[in-house]
């Protein structure tokens, strides 16, 4: 047998057609990713340093002027503050709610499937429809004010300056917090599923060992469950921060294109939307998008550093 025939009959040679077929299958998705994601990012960087016209394309090279104008704009500064505040409050609140719901439905309870579906339902409902419903609920004559009046809670709310006909989403003091509560309700079901998958990946042997050592439920949760959920925490926190920094539809529906009242609901993505599709200043909008990209990327790196990896047992 010569070397050529031996090579032809080797396992590596026999797997070569399968490898080629595999590369052909992934070629189209990889190409689309490079064009639609990496290509779009590179092009955004390119047009952000030009005075860009919708009809003629790049006209005048202006360097970092778009970035300087954006960072000097008081409205954009407000948008950054609102976006960071929303993310800083909404992310931990929703993670706590999601984990709490996951712990509940992870138990062997009667009607477990029903509760899982009920908790998850707001996440699959139309965001626009739920936001409109929430606006009616939180209106001056809405359900929330009516219920707290029936419960005799008006004096308590008046201590904080909120009258019996408080317009929660129309007041600069409460508008963003109202949106935070809305999104905590609608997205906690999704995070519940993420945490439920992480909880079910933990071996029962770990809990049995903790029980033998005399650990209480709280000790087992804090010393066993929480450390083993680090990868789950990282995934949920990353998804949440990316979503939080891109808050748009609820802010647009609740406060209009100007983020009313008084820019209380102005976010970075809403500001970007106005620059691109109301002012048609696409180079300026590209600069805003890249600032948002840097913020999201930096937040992801910080979370990776904080959560690290799960311990070995």
Would you name each region that the model predicts?
Residues 1-16:
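Short, Lys/Arg-rich, polar N-terminal cytosolic tail immediately upstream
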């Amino acid at each position: 047998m010569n070397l050529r025939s031996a090579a032809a009959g080797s396992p590596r040679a026999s797997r070569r057609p399968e490898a080629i077929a595999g590369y052909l299958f992934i070629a189209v998705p990889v190409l689309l990713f490079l064009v639609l994601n990496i290509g779009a990012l590179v092009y955004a960087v390119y047009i952000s340093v030009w005075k860009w016209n919708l009809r003629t394309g790049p006209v005048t090279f202006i360097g970092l002027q778009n970035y300087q104008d954006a960072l000097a704009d008081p409205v954009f500064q407000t948008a950054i503050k609102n976006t960071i505040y929303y993310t800083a409050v909404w992310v931990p609140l929703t993670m706590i709610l999601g984990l709490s719901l996951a712990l509940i439905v992870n138990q062997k309870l009667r009607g477990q499937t029903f509760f899982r579906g009920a908790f998850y339902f707001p996440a699959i409902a139309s965001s626009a429809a739920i936001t409109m419903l929430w606006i009616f609920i939180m209106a001056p004559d809405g359900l929330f004010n009516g219920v707290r009046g029936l419960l005799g809670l008006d004096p308590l709310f008046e201590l904080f300056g909120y009258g019996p006909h408080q317009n929660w989403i129309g007041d600069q003091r409460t508008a963003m917090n109202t949106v935070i509560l809305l999104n905590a309700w609608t997205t906690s079901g999704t995070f519940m599923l993420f945490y439920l998958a992480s909880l079910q990946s933990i071996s029962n042997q770990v809990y049995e060992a903790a029980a033998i050592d005399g650990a209480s439920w709280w000790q087992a949760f804090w010393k066993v469950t929480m450390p083993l959920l680090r990868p789950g925490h990282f995934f949920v926190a990353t998804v949440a921060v990316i979503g939080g920094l891109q808050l748009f539809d609820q802010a647009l529906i609740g406060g209009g294109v100007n983020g009313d009242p008084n820019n209380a609901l102005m976010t970075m993505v809403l500001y970007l939307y106005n620059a691109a599709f109301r002012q048609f200043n696409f180079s300026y909008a590209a600069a805003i998008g890249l600032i948002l990209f840097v913020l999201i990327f930096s937040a992801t790196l910080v979370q990776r550093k904080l959560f690290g990896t799960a311990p070995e047992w």
